[in-house]
Every structure is written in C-alpha cells, then in structure tokens.
C-alpha cells in the first residue's frame, strides 16, 4: 500500500453546472448550509494540527465548484504558505476561471485540472445540464487563460459517457499533441445517481454503464500509436503519450481496473467528513463535529491515525460495500470527487 500523503479537500457542494454524472438536473439535492461548511480557520487548523503532522503534504481543492467558495484566493494563499505544503492543486469546471486564474496562480496554486467533457457546445450543454448560451465558450476561455498565466502543464479531465461523448475521444486526445496539456480520460462512475442518463436513447442503445479505459486507449492507439510516458502525477492515472506530442494522455480506471494498491489519498467533504475510500462509505469520521465539540487536535489526530491504519482493509476487503444495492448516501458533488 502506498504512503497516504494526499488530501482532497471539498470546499463547497454547490456548483454553477449540473453535470449529469455529479448532480443531475431534477434530483433533490440537500445543499449544505453555509454555517455547516468547514470555515477557513477550521480548514487551516485541521491541516496544521492533524493532517500535516500525519505526513500529508499534497492537497487538492475540489467541490462542487471550488471557485464559488467565498475567499478562495485567500484560502489558496494560506494553504500554499504552509511550510509542509509540497503540492497544491485544484479541480474546477473552469467557468469562472478567466477572471481568477492570475490571482490563483500568484497566490500559490501550483496545478489545475479543468473538466472538459466535450468539444461540441451542444453535447457540452447536455452533459452540464444547462441551456444557457455560451457555457462552453466561457469554459474554453478559462482553459486558455489558465494556460496563458502559467499553469503549464494544464490538465483536462474528461469523463467518458457511453453514447454521449465517446465519439470525441480522438479529438480530445489530440489536444495533447500541440500544447503541454495532459488529457485525463476518466471512466464514468454513477455514484449516488443510479438513474443517470437513463432517459437518453443513446445510453439505452449503448447498453453499458461505462467505457473501459482499455477501449479508450485502443481508439487512440489505432489513430496515432501510444507510448508509455515517464511523467507520473500524484494520482492513479496510467499515463501515455502520442508519439511526438508535447502533452500526455492518462487513464483513470476506477471501474474496470482496481488500483487500491496505489491509493495515496483521503477525502475531506465540505462539511467535514473524512472519507478513506471513494468506492465505499466505511470508516468515515465527522471531523467538524469533533472540532466544534472542543475535542483536542491531538485526539482528532489519533482518530485519523487509526483510520490510516485500517485504510488498506477498507480499500481491499470492503471496496464495493458502498454500492451493494446500487445506492450511495452521497453524490459525487457531496463527496468532492
């Protein structure tokens, strides 16, 4: 089992998109009240007094949409300035990024992942669940701006949805050829949303829940060829290059290939729940309640340390326990991805 040194921190469960694999339109979502979110000060306290002493040094800010979090630039600056912070990154949908990219970069954000599931504005609108015009164009502007201000390499996350955007695999992979962009293809994972896209004829026709990474790789391999890359990130992606490309293509295969032995992370939800595994809901700790009840940082740290010792069992032996019935208590937007 890898050393666990990477914490994904969800800052907010709200989003300005309604991506169908994350928070589908029409679903009843109980948003966290603002007073139930971990505060700026509570987050910094947990990092300084609990996680960093336990060896965590890599932090990723997620959501919901993290750029909706009030004071996001100040929070980035405070986390980046912690002496133990080796890497600080963010996953965003990019819609608000054009006006914030420069400030985030100057505040100390090292890396950024931007969700881009389609190059077709109409398909993009379908996936994000919005009818408002120019959503794709604004997102694309955010991507270009982030690259221009210094986020180089830039990572683009693509959730491949059968019958919806799988016909764009080659076009999206091609983005890695001329710029130092890392394209990450992610297997569709219907956590908390068992009816995802069930009303779309394309999905019914496709007759499958996800497109396996090997199938995606083969499409790219047949067009250009693929070679293994010596660039490795902090996550579970298997990374390759199109020969001669400036960037890379990576594959995150949480549905078709078990990578529990490479897991190096935990997840902290916006309301303070620490989750050791994405695929099940065993062993979670309510850190916010402990903190607000006056429990000492030492005591909280001991509880997290114990969770770290049992994490391998949770990853391996209980890997599928969160979906025995096909139902998760939380959607991806609430977990933080």
Swiss-Prot record:
Residues annotated for GTP binding in this entry: 8, 60, 91, 155, 265-267
Cofactor(s) for this UniProt protein: [4Fe-4S] cluster
EC class (word): lyase
Residues noted as binding S-adenosyl-L-methionine in the record, renumbered to the chain: 21, 64, 115, 189
InterPro entries the UniProt entry points to: Aldolase_TIM, Elp3/MiaA/NifB-like_rSAM, MoaA, MoaA_NifB_PqqE_Fe-S-bd_CS, MoaA_twitch, MoCo_biosynth_MoaA/MoaC, rSAM
Record: residues binding [4Fe-4S] cluster 2: 260, 263, 277
PROSITE patterns cross-referenced by the UniProt entry: MOAA_NIFB_PQQE, RADICAL_SAM
Keyword terms: 4Fe-4S, GTP-binding, Iron, Iron-sulfur, Lyase, Metal-binding, Molybdenum cofactor biosynthesis, Nucleotide-binding, S-adenosyl-L-methionine
GO process terms (BP): Mo-molybdopterin cofactor biosynthetic process
Family matches, as Pfam families: Fer4_12 (PF13353), Mob_synth_C (PF06463), Radical_SAM (PF04055)
Residues that coordinate or bind [4Fe-4S] cluster 1: 15, 19, 22
Entry keyword annotation includes Iron: yes
Chemical reaction(s) catalysed: GTP + AH2 + S-adenosyl-L-methionine = (8S)-3',8-cyclo-7,8-dihydroguanosine 5'-triphosphate + 5'-deoxyadenosine + L-methionine + A + H(+)
Cofactor descriptive note: Binds 2 [4Fe-4S] clusters. Binds 1 [4Fe-4S] cluster coordinated with 3 cysteines and an exchangeable S-adenosyl-L-methionine and 1 [4Fe-4S] cluster coordinated with 3 cysteines and the GTP-derived substrate.
Keyword Cytoplasm: no
Molecular functions (GO terms): 4 iron, 4 sulfur cluster binding; cyclic pyranopterin monophosphate synthase activity; GTP 3',8'-cyclase activity; GTP binding; metal ion binding; S-adenosyl-L-methionine binding
UniProt pathway annotation: Cofactor biosynthesis; molybdopterin biosynthesis
Residues in Radical SAM core domain copies: 1-226
EC number: 4.1.99.22
Subunit organization: Monomer and homodimer.
Family that this chain belongs to: Belongs to the radical SAM superfamily. MoaA family.
Function, as annotated: Catalyzes the cyclization of GTP to (8S)-3',8-cyclo-7,8-dihydroguanosine 5'-triphosphate.
Protein name in the entry: GTP 3',8-cyclase
Originating species: Crocosphaera subtropica (strain ATCC 51142 / BH68)
Lineage, highest ranks first: Bacteria, Bacillati, Cyanobacteriota, Cyanophyceae, Oscillatoriophycideae
